[in-house]
C-alpha cells in the first residue's frame, strides 16, 4: 500500500494496522491517533467511564457542546452555525450508551505486538498545538513504539481541526508528506 491515514479514533486503528505488518505500507500519517492505555485494568475502566460521561454530557446539552466546540470556530465558512449545530446535536443523540462505551473502550484498549513489524514504513504523527497536552501520552507512546516516527505539531490547531475545518491546508500538508517521502525513497534507490 502506498499510503495510509488515520485520524482520531481512526488513528487508533492505524498503529495496530502498521504494527501487525500484514499489508506493507510505504508511508503513514497518524493524525492525533489514540494509542492504547498503559495502566491497570481498573484505571482503564475509570478512564472509559470518564470518556463515556463526557460524551454523554456533550450529547445531552447544547450549551456544553457549544462551550467545548464553539460554533464560530467549528463551522465551515458559508455555513449556518445554528443549522450545523442542530444537526450535530441531533446526530449525537443517536448513539446508545453501549455504542459510546464500546467506541471508547476499543479505541483505548487494543493490543499490539511487543515490537512492531519491520516494514520500512515512514510514519509521521500529527497533532494540533492546542491539543498537545491532551495527546501527551499518545505522543510518548508513538516515540517509544515507533522510534523512527516523525512528530509534527500543527500550529494553532485543536483536535481534528486541520482535516475538518481547513481541507485545503490538510491537502497541502498531506501531499507535502507524500511527495517528500517519495523523493527521499527515490534517493535511496
Regions found by a protein language model. Give the residues of each.
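Short beta-strand immediately N-terminal to the catalytic nucleophile in serine-hydrolase-like folds
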Residues: 4-6, 31
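Short beta-strand/loop motif that positions the catalytic acidic residue
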Residues: 119, 125-127
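Catalytic histidine-centered segment of alpha/beta-hydrolase-like enzymes
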Residues: 157-168
Amino acid at each position: 500500500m502506498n499510503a495510509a491515514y488515520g485520524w482520531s479514533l481512526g488513528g487508533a486503528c492505524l498503529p495496530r494496522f502498521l504494527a501487525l505488518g500484514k499489508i506493507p505500507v510505504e508511508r503513514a500519517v497518524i493524525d492525533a491517533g489514540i494509542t492504547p492505555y498503559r495502566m491497570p485494568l481498573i484505571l482503564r475502566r475509570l478512564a472509559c467511564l470518564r470518556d463515556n460521561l463526557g460524551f454523554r454530557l456533550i450529547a445531552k446539552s447544547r450549551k456544553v457542546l457549544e462551550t467545548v466546540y464553539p460554533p464560530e470556530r467549528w463551522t465551515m465558512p458559508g455555513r449556518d452555525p445554528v443549522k450545523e449545530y442542530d444537526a450535530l446535536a441531533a446526530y449525537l443523540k443517536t448513539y446508545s450508551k453501549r455504542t459510546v462505551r464500546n467506541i471508547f473502550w476499543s479505541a483505548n484498549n487494543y493490543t499490539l505486538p511487543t515490537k512492531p513489524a519491520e516494514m520500512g514504513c515512514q510514519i509521521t504523527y500529527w497533532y494540533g498545538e492546542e491539543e498537545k497536552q491532551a495527546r501527551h501520552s499518545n505522543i510518548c507512546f508513538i516515540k517509544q513504539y515507533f522510534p523512527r516516527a516523525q512528530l509534527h505539531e500543527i500550529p494553532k490547531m485543536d483536535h481534528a481541526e486541520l482535516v475538518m475545518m481547513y481541507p485545503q491546508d490538510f491537502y497541502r500538508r498531506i501531499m507535502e508528506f507524500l511527495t517528500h517521502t517519495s523523493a527521499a525513497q527515490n534517493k535511496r534507490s
